[in-house]
Amino acid sequence: MPKNFKKHLPLKKYGQNFLINKDTIKNIIKIIDPKTTETLVEIGPGLAALTKPMCELLEELIVIEIDQDLLFLLKKRSFYSKLIVFYQNALNFNFLNLFHKKKQLIRIFGNLPYNISTSLIIFLFKQIKVIQDMNFMLQKEVAERLISTPGNKSYGRLSIISQYYCDIKILLNVSPEDFRPIPKVHSVFINLKPHTNSPYFVYNVNILSAITKDAFQNRRKILRHSLKNLFSEKELIKLEINSNLRAENVSVSHYCKLANYLYKKSNNLLKIN
């Protein structure tokens, strides 16, 4: 157990569970495989379980931390001079500005707090054009939602939006015993890599988001009912989408097809008016 653990009580409001297993830490560093020429950002360095070994391989590491007590402990570490520290909520961080400053894509990693992991990933998708890849420790249940496919209970809006933006892989299963305090859930370490040649295309991702919101608000309803305010049954037939399917049985590509149809339909209506 890290010496600093006794000096800092994990705060529930920040969802803090600190990684302590040395073998797991080594495996994660190996997975990330950092290069000195890259711009790397760690979200939530905590007690520096990943920060310290990363600094041994890098000349500079950017960290974002919201807990002032943890920053105070971090300042006492021998590798602190290698850090560029941002004391703020990662949900407010401007990665676009960092990209313009560094003039290269950004690699982001971290042991994400369970209470903000989903919100943070959605936030990062909005800045995806400046991100090279993301490597995160997540609650296993959240990771399963990210990679889930049609027909599974875990398949939903998060699955569709995540797979639209990224290729996602679970790389490591992590036991609750690897953390302090010990969480009640299992974790996994995952990689999210923005598509180089995306299998999906939409004119407007906000329309895709709106359609999936309507569909999954009533996930047990069939499409012709859950999406009746957006599409007629004739339109669904025209798009070769089975109107008797439930939201959880519709593929990402079909949701993209719906989004593009609605985009064109809306534009045509604007031209008429």
UniProtKB/Swiss-Prot annotation:
Primary subcellular site in the record, as a coarse category: cytoplasm
Keywords on record: Cytoplasm, Methyltransferase, RNA-binding, rRNA processing, S-adenosyl-L-methionine, Transferase
GO CC annotation: cytosol
PROSITE patterns, per the entry: RRNA_A_DIMETH, SAM_RNA_A_N6_MT
InterPro entries per UniProt: KsgA/Erm, rRNA_Ade_diMease-like_C, rRNA_Ade_Mease_Trfase_CS, rRNA_Ade_methylase_Trfase_N, rRNA_adenine_dimethylase, SAM-dependent_MTases_sf
Binding-site positions, S-adenosyl-L-methionine: N17, L19, G44, E65, N111
Gene3D superfamilies, A to Z: Ribosomal RNA adenine dimethylase-like, domain 2 (1.10.8.100), Vaccinia Virus protein VP39 (3.40.50.150)
Location of the protein in the cell: Cytoplasm
Catalytic reaction list: adenosine(1518)/adenosine(1519) in 16S rRNA + 4 S-adenosyl-L-methionine = N(6)-dimethyladenosine(1518)/N(6)-dimethyladenosine(1519) in 16S rRNA + 4 S-adenosyl-L-homocysteine + 4 H(+)
Enzyme Commission numbers on file: 2.1.1.182
NCBIfam families in the record: ksgA (TIGR00755)
Family indicated by similarity: Belongs to the class I-like SAM-binding methyltransferase superfamily. rRNA adenine N(6)-methyltransferase family. RsmA subfamily.
Protein's UniProt name: Ribosomal RNA small subunit methyltransferase A
Organism: Buchnera aphidicola subsp. Acyrthosiphon pisum (strain APS)
Gene name tied to this protein: rsmA
